[in-house]
Amino acid sequence: MLYTLMHRDTAVMDLELDEYSNIVALGKIHHAEHLPLGTYNKIGVERKSLNRWWTKRSIPASRRGIRDVLDELELSSPQELIEKCFGLSLSDQYWISPTDKPLDWHKVNFFENTFSEDIGNILFGKGRSSGSASLISPDNTANGNLKKKWKIIDGKRVLLKGSSAPYRQEAYNEVLASEIARRLCIPY
């Protein structure tokens, strides 16, 4: 499938994804200055580097509960989830727009628009709301090993995190580290 890598509403470059959401071909560069860090060098864009960046946007295969999500959705890898939500995230403003049916950033981004909680609910063992699961979710691009899901609470985007056995302390450690940084006036 052919896409344009976008940075908000700026076209960055054209690319092609295979059926497993791997970048198999690079096309025209529209705005090299908007390419993700680490994907561009003196020679140009390296497909390998861009693929690594793209893959790291996905939920790691080692995350607890991801196999349940993939089985329920009949997908073979977490990377396939990225394409289903156009690579949209609440961590940055990169995404992909189909070249045959371009999308508008302001109508699809998760900063301004609602999103499905189905993937996050499945990851937390709650199952989907009803019918087929909606894949338009920032949970598809919430990388890291802790289970997590995005939720809109009183109009704010909030990241809910779980912890892992045996001590289940990772999320508490993050809160403690944030509080220490705040008290020491360290930007975080």
What is each of the regions a protein language model found here?
Residues M1-Y188:
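Phosphate/dinucleotide-binding and metal-coordinating scaffold of catalytic cores
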